[in-house]
Structures are given as C-alpha cells and as structure tokens.
C-alpha cells in the first residue's frame, strides 16, 4: 500500500480516485459513527479548488496527502485563502516544564497525579460538618497539554475533558442542582433528571440543561462557544442575555460579549473526545493553536497572512507531529518547518 501511495497522482482533475483510495479517504475523514461522507463530492470539491489556483505557482503545494499506518491517518485539504489585516509576526507559545498528566485535587489539598484517564466519581457521597450542615468540599480535575480525560459525575453524567482544561464541582452536587465550573473544553452527556437542573459555568456564559449532549469550549483569549448535539439548553451571557438552543446550533461569544446563535454541523466539534482532530473550513491559526496546545509546541507565523487560510483537516491525536507538519507543508500556499520545539509558517 505504501508503494501505491508513493505513486499517488496530485493532478486530481484528470482522474477519479480508485476504490481503495476512496476507502482510505473515508478512514481519514473518520466518520465511523454515522454514514460515510460522499467521497466523490469531496474529491470534486478539491479538484475545483485546485483548478482555481495558478498551476505554475501551486502545483507542488496544492495536493491531497494521505499516510496509512497501523494507528495513524491524516487528511488535509486546502480550501481557500482569505485576505486579512495582519502585518507582523504572530506566535502561540508553548508552556515550559510541562508534564503530560491528569490531576485530581480535593478541596484545598495538593493536586494528585492519577494514572488513569477514566475517572469515576459516581460513588461520591455528601458530607456534613460537625454542626450537621452540608459541606461544599471541592473536587478539581485538571488536564495538562497533550492529555484528555473522561469521568463519570456523581449522578451518572459523563464528561470528556479536553487538553489544558479544568472542571470543578462540590459535595453539594445533586442536592438541589447539579453545577460544575469549566475552563477549557468539555463534552457532556447529561443524565436526565428534571428535578435537578444541570448547570455549567464558564468565565463567559452559563449553560442550563435538563438532559442532553453538548460541547462547551471556553479557553482564555479565544472565542467561546456552546454546541448542542441533542436536547435543549439555555445559555446566559455575562450581561444576562439568554438564548435557547436546539440541536444542531452553536452559540459563540467573544470574551463574554454579545452572543451569536447559528446553525452548524456539530460533528467536527465533538470528534476530539473520540481521539481525532477534526476541522472543517477552519482558519489555519485556529488549527495551529489546537496543535500547539496538544503537542505543547511553539507556533510562529512569520507570514501572518497564512493565519486565515481555511483548511479541512483530520488527524488522529496519536499522529506524530512531524507527519502532520509534512502534510501541511504540501497543501498551504507557503512553507511549514519544525525544529527546536517550534513550528514556523512562512
């Protein structure tokens, strides 16, 4: 198979993919939990995009790159290049001295590194102080860069916590309400309980649900959002404005400002919990930020105009970063290099 891909032709306008190539493309796209995408349509979109580029300038850069290995598949598709207002070098910086780990901190104690990425708090009991009052002892679960975790809360709600994220809840969870605080990104499959509303607090908004599946992303200095997969939720902004969401909708907010609701394909937003990077028509700056967070590597845009290049990008999170860089270098209208814990785009 490796020999076949070494012979892979990049001139997509002259032929359609073979049956085996279509199969690998489906694998790369990663849609195993629902019907496979229309590979022919994807191929035609790619060919159309290539046809809009000057052949002499982009012949070596505009291509589909595929690599099939025992447990690694990457798929990158160059879609569009939009002008932007950046005129200086831009960078996302790695965190020095970081270790890849998941920690659990009980109340004000010292964080404890756990050896598993699957945590079970379903046996957590409510405690009282000497006066017989319910305590509010905190439990904090934190993931470092390059690590994610799955946990079961006391009521049976399942949470996936993405890299560099934190979730906090107290012993009072489930008494009247089920409340958690999230920084970073988390996906929830909420146990249905109409008597105890489920509430997620972030620095930018509060989400209230009864029983549903949704994704919350609230990293510092990034656009925050809620993506609803099923059920119904109520999102309240920092200024008190409220939006009711239906399945297949996303609510975005910039630094806790005005919220905007629109329809979206929820699939790309939740694939991280299944071990994939999945971006669809996403600016290269956002993609590189996520890669930098996962691999804890510096990202430097020597050519800031590349930040708004849109890509369709899929890769397993176990993929070697060097392979990802090689694939990006083949498709963007520029150059990508890696060395000394730094990826440079120019």
Regions found by a protein language model. Name each.
Residues 22-27, 257-346:
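N-terminal export/assembly leaders
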Residues 46-221, 237-256, 339-340:
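Short acidic/polar, Gly/Pro-enriched loop/turn segments located at secondary-structure boundaries
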